[in-house]
């Protein structure tokens, strides 16, 4: 049995909190009949308990989670033509762990500037938002460079429908 299907592809929607990863991935998955996984669902219990107590996760905490996402991507890619995973993937070495061993994985970076994302977060109903949380996300973000040729960029300074359409266009073009 083959372990990979080269006609199938995984797209990891990445970006800072508030960039629209979950909303975009959910709608794109619906329109393309693609598999969809919110990466947060695979956090180990220890990470969930740590976050619930207000402690930020460190790189050591994230490593088993990123490995679980890599395994999930591998499994999804075997049976689904297009699969979408939501994961902030803010640091290059996080992206390296996610792509390890899977040449059929690309990233879609939902890119927006601080002001655009801050205004969206403030507009969310029933969402507790602290500006410092977004500042920290941008400080942590290592924007993909030219050496990361598997990263596709979608500008999010447009309505959700436009971001969804741009994301679908990027997927249909391939890498």
From Swiss-Prot:
GO terms for biological process: carbohydrate metabolic process. PANTHER family: GLUCONOKINASE-RELATED (PTHR43442), THERMORESISTANT GLUCONOKINASE (PTHR43442:SF1). ATP binds at residues 15-22. GO terms for molecular function: ATP binding; gluconokinase activity; protein homodimerization activity. Pathway: Carbohydrate acid metabolism; D-gluconate degradation. Pfam families: SKI. Keywords: ATP-binding, Kinase, Nucleotide-binding, Transferase. The keyword Kinase applies. This is Thermoresistant gluconokinase. It catalyses: D-gluconate + ATP = 6-phospho-D-gluconate + ADP + H(+). Belongs to the gluconokinase GntK/GntV family. It comes from Escherichia coli (strain K12). Its EC number is 2.7.1.12. InterPro entries: P-loop_NTPase (IPR027417), Shikimate/glucono_kinase (IPR031322), Therm_gnt_kin (IPR006001).
């Amino acid at each position: 049995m083959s372990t990979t299907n080269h006609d199938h592809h995984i797209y990891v929607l990445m970006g800072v909190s508030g960039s629209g990863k979950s909303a975009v991935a959910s709608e794109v998955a619906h329109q393309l009949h693609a598999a969809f996984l919110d990466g947060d669902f695979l956090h180990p219990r220890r990470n969930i308990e740590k976050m619930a107590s207000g402690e930020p996760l460190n790189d050591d905490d994230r490593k088993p989670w990123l490995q679980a996402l890599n395994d999930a991507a591998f499994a999804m890619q075997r049976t689904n033509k297009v699969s979408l995973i939501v994961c902030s993937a803010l640091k290059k070495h996080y992206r390296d762990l996610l792509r390890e061993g899977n040449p059929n994985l690309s990233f879609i970076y939902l890119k927006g500037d601080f002001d655009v994302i801050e205004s969206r977060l403030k507009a969310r109903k029933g969402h507790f938002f602290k500006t410092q949380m977004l500042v920290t996300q941008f400080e942590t973000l290592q924007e993909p460079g030219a050496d990361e040729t598997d990263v596709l960029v979608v500008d999010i300074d447009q309505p959700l429908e436009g971001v969804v359409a741009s994301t679908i266009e990027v997927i249909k073009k391939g890498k």
